[in-house]
């Protein structure tokens, strides 16, 4: 299926996300912060279909990561996650760059739906 980069600083949540993605046939790589995510993107030649990133993380937050990823890897789908209302508001200015924002806590069904929707939208835009 898709190759997904997950940037999430909370290890238990990161593990749940990786298991859910694997159960749906996705190949995932995980990082604990935005700095590691930038290294992973570069190390894999940007060959990811989706970046799923928390907004509030150490080293580099998800907003900064999304801006760099969108600039350096056009065509990469970006989906943000947050449990904070003020962080969700910060993401509002990024509509043109991201596929959406998942509000924590979210169910596995919500995660799977958001990932599937993001991948479909990006796939359609690559064809158009």
Spell out what each predicted region is.
Residues 8:
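Conserved acidic carboxylate
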Residues 33-36, 61-65:
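Acidic catalytic/metal-coordinating carboxylates
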Residues 64, 84-102, 109, 113:
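Alpha4 helix (beta4-alpha4-beta5 surface) of REC/receiver domains from two-component response regulators
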Residues 106-118, 123, 127:
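C-terminal output helix
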